[in-house]
């Protein structure tokens, strides 16, 4: 076993990851029949990273309603007909030693599908975007129940971990940010009110899900009068009280913004939330080397490393990272002669 922290196990609620590497959820827009079902591409895409020894494979943003899709070719979990394909996917991933997670999502005003799109307020993302319909309280209630049903289906499909997508300008993020939420009822105004939708979604999911629960957040709006990491420390404390186990810390995309991007540019947000809210965090964003990942973990800045585009470039990134750290990890027996 490697003595590098990146390759130490991580355990929670009966789920043990063999290492701290997470395949970050990345939309593939590959449900080409527009029915939200798993396709052969998804099987190849995710299973190849399991063969590559990723500890946790997180399936991309999966829509809890048809109108909550980012595109009409997104994966879906709004119908029982989606369960079989997702179950086949989780089963195959686990065959190769990885654990499985799914990100439950609703795109809100950033949905690019036919028909009505919804948001907390009738404010478009930008001048080139459609204007959403402001959600009624009944719309909100139905959406909360859609997340609950999505969690039930995720459980039926055999996922080990659920993540609620509260980042990147999608519906939950839109409710959290005062830049996109101008409501005057109990879902707008104060931080407590803007958090209410996420609170209700977490409570609903936990009614049917006892396993590890993550929430992805955008810890900065990168705009004056928008949210910053201090606001998310407060939200994270509330999430912890509700039983959320880990905050997956990203940033941006609730409104157009100029973002100074550099290697590990979001790690400081994960560090701050971890320290000040006393909750486990995942670091994500331009983490490309084993040395970089190991530094984050060794210095207690995050608990898990979410790797995105680097895993698109290199499905066997765990082996690459191990080599960079001058250590060895066990690989597939079929690859012994080259591993």
Curated annotation (Swiss-Prot):
**Is the keyword Oxidoreductase in the record?**
yes
Q: Extract the SUPFAM superfamilies matched here.
A: FMN-linked oxidoreductases
Subunit architecture: Homotetramer.
Query: Which principal EC class is assigned to this enzyme?
Result: oxidoreductase
**CDD domains the UniProt entry points to:** OYE_YqiM_FMN
What's the name of its gene?
Answer: namA
- Gene source species: Bacillus licheniformis (strain ATCC 14580 / DSM 13 / JCM 2505 / CCUG 7422 / NBRC 12200 / NCIMB 9375 / NCTC 10341 / NRRL NRS-1264 / Gibson 46)
Which keywords does the record carry? Detoxification, Flavoprotein, FMN, NADP, Oxidoreductase
UniProt protein name: NADPH dehydrogenase
Describe its function. Catalyzes the reduction of the double bond of an array of alpha,beta-unsaturated aldehydes and ketones. It also reduces the nitro group of nitroester and nitroaromatic compounds. It could have a role in detoxification processes.
Cite the source lineage.
Bacteria, Bacillati, Bacillota, Bacilli, Bacillales
Q: Which domain of life is it from?
A: Bacteria
Reaction equation(s) it catalyzes:
A + NADPH + H(+) = AH2 + NADP(+)
Instruction: Give the cofactors, semicolon-separated.
Output: FMN
């Amino acid at each position: 076993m490697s003595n590098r922290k990146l390759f130490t196990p991580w355990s929670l609620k009966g789920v043990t990851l063999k290492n701290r590497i997470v395949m970050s959820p990345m939309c593939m827009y590959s449900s080409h029949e527009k029915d939200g079902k798993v396709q052969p591409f998804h099987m190849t895409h995710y299973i190849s990273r399991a063969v590559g020894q990723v500890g946790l494979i997180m399936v991309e943003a999966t829509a809890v309603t048809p109108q909550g899709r980012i595109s009409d070719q997104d994966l879906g979990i709004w119908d029982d007909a989606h369960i079989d394909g997702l179950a086949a996917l989780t089963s195959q991933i686990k065959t190769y030693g990885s654990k499985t997670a799914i990100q439950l999502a609703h795109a809100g005003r950033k949905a690019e599908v036919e028909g009505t799109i919804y948001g907390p307020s009738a404010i478009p993302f930008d001048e080139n975007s459609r204007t959403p319909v402001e959600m009624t309280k009944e719309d909100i209630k139905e959406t909360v129940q859609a997340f609950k049903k999505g969690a039930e289906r995720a459980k039926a499909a055999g996922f080990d971990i659920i993540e609620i997508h509260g980042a990147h300008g999608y519906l939950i993020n839109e409710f959290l940010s005062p830049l996109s939420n101008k409501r005057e009822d109990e879902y707008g105004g104060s931080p407590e009110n803007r958090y209410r939708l996420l609170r209700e979604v977490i409570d609903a999911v936990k009614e049917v899900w006892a396993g590890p629960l993550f929430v992805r957040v955008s810890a900065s709006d990168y705009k004056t009068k928008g949210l910053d990491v201090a606001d998310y420390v407060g939200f994270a404390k509330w999430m912890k009280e509700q039983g959320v186990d880990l905050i997956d810390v990203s940033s941006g995309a609730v409104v157009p913004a100029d973002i100074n991007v550099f290697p590990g540019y979001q790690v400081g947000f994960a560090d701050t939330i971890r320290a000040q809210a006393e909750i486990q965090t995942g670091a994500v964003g331009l983490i490309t080397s084993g040395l970089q990942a190991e530094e984050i973990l060794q210095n207690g800045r995050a608990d898990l490393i979410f790797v995105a585009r680097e895993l698109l470039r290199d499905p066997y990134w765990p082996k690459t990272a191990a080599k960079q750290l001058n250590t060895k990890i066990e690989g597939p027996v079929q690859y012994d002669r080259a591993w």
